[in-house]
Amino acid sequence: KTIPKIRQLVEALCTSYGAPVSSSLINGAMVNHDPINAAPGGGIHGKGPEAFAAKTNTGQRLFSFPSPKELSRASLDELKELKLGYRAKYIYQLCQDAVSGALDLALLDTMDYGTALGYLTGFYGIGKKVANCVCLFGLHHIGAFPVDTWIEKILMAQYYDKRKYRRTPKTCLCDTIVKDVFGQYGGCAGVMQQYIFYYERLRNSKLS
């Protein structure tokens, strides 16, 4: 998905199932809250407001990102109506898991990177890339290095050495390159991932 399209999908979730948010809450301080039930949302850590604006006949309204409990009230068909595509079934099941306690978000917040990565990939719909995104952006494990289509292209174009990696299986090629190239940054590989992603997108004038 393109970045604008992803924004549209997130906004659809917020406006459909999030709670209205006062602009004073966005500008003021937020206290920590229960990640399962509380709204407005603030990521896994619950340390700040996450809100999206929706244009209405009376101007702009702000909506929180829905908590798992709020989103679990949506049926699978209702989620599909938001044009989430194949993601709808994953979102539906993960919200059910979070509300039931099978997916323990509070426990996840206490885990180290390796433990969190293994825990997340044990749930339906969460692969290694998404788990690494959660670890990097939601849990602040800055050693996490998500590899999506864009990052894979960058790795192959800028860091792939045919002679060095000629015997490396394709299934672990990107992981091997990441370890060799970015393992030298002392657990900050995720920071470097953001730099190379931004640079490549900016160089190709595709940031939006």
Where on the chain are the PLM-derived regions?
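HhH-family (HhH-GPD) DNA N-glycosylase catalytic core used in base-excision repair
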Residues: 1-208
